[in-house]
Curated annotation (Swiss-Prot):
CDD domains associated with the record: Cyt_c_Oxidase_III (cd01665)
Record's subunit section: Component of the cytochrome c oxidase (complex IV, CIV), a multisubunit enzyme composed of 14 subunits. The complex is composed of a catalytic core of 3 subunits MT-CO1, MT-CO2 and MT-CO3, encoded in the mitochondrial DNA, and 11 supernumerary subunits COX4I, COX5A, COX5B, COX6A, COX6B, COX6C, COX7A, COX7B, COX7C, COX8 and NDUFA4, which are encoded in the nuclear genome.
Family according to the record: Belongs to the cytochrome c oxidase subunit 3 family.
Record topological domains on the Mitochondrial matrix side: 1-15, 67-72, 153-155, 224-232
Gene Ontology CC annotations of this record: mitochondrial inner membrane; respiratory chain complex IV
Residues making up the signal peptide according to the UniProt record: none
Protein name according to UniProt: Cytochrome c oxidase subunit 3
Transmembrane segments: 16-34, 41-66, 73-105, 129-152, 156-183, 191-223, 233-256
Gene: MT-CO3
Length: 261
């Protein structure tokens, strides 16, 4: 921040936007190669470069904020707006899936047998694994709030305990969802029901994995004393994201599992 007359962070030249663009090219080309020629070489290369880019880019952001002090209150305000806009974009992303589901289920076509679930589909019991999954995510919402309040009060150990519980619950949810997919009596190719079910719940599951990874990073950062009671936006963003994942699941449970069955 030397020789600056403003509170903004002037970012140094970085290779990561270029490697990120390259990884996007490799991933999209790799998907085409996988779909048409059953070759995963290019896709694997794209995913690997994408993961390496994300790791190193966020590592640099942590260095700039924690060790170099570039994240002033003004910069943090901008990051908050950015995270809010990102979550709004995710809400609209999931709105598309709910739209597809309700479009198909509220007025089933003759091809579906004129009923919902379509003829021949045996939906999952909403009072079994889906209800347990709901309980797990609601409990994780409580524990992440406990972690946040502990951090704001400067209670390091309770914060670590609560964050560890949240991560464990997130991993447990993922394992339950994987077992449910494995045992489901229908597949993604079983018409519009299978498509909407697996795409909506699958993307939510991916978001749980991303959120769990975000929280694991926060856990290791807290072990290294990166967060203080008044400077912890990295954790706050992870908590916001986790609450978003919670709320989306409640809508999925009520719409697809309970009403849709």
């Amino acid at each position: 921040m030397t020789h600056q007359t403003h509170a903004y962070h002037m970012v140094n030249p970085s290779p990561w936007p270029l490697t990120g663009a390259l990884s996007a090219l490799l991933m999209t080309s790799g998907l085409i190669m996988w779909f048409h020629f059953n070759s995963t070489t290019l896709l694997t290369l794209g995913l690997t470069t994408n993961m390496l880019t994300m790791y190193q880019w966020w590592r640099d952001v942590i260095r700039e904020s924690t060790f170099q002090g570039h994240h002033t209150p003004t910069v943090q305000k901008g990051l908050r707006y950015g995270m809010i806009l990102f979550i709004i974009s995710e809400v609209l992303f999931f709105t598309g899936f709910f739209w597809a589901f309700y479009h198909s289920s509220l007025a089933p076509t003759p091809e579906l047998g004129g009923c919902w679930p379509p003829t021949g589909i045996h939906p999952l019991n909403p009072l079994e694994v889906p209800l347990l999954n709901t309980s797990v995510l609601l409990a994780s919402g409580v524990s992440i709030t406990w972690a946040h309040h502990s951090l704001m009060e400067g209670n390091r150990n309770p914060m670590l305990q609560a964050l560890f519980i949240t991560i464990a619950l997130g991993i447990y949810f993922t394992l339950l969802q994987a077992s449910e997919y494995y045992e489901a009596p229908f597949t993604i190719s079983d018409g519009v029901y299978g498509s909407t079910f697996f795409v909506a719940t699958g993307f939510h599951g991916l978001h749980v994995i991303i959120g769990s990874t975000f929280l694991i990073v926060c856990f290791f950062r807290q072990l290294k004393f990166h967060f203080t009671s008044n400077h912890h936006f990295g954790f706050e963003a992870a908590a916001w994201y986790w609450h978003f994942v919670d709320v989306v699941w409640l809508f999925l449970y009520v719409s697809i599992y309970w009403w849709g069955s």
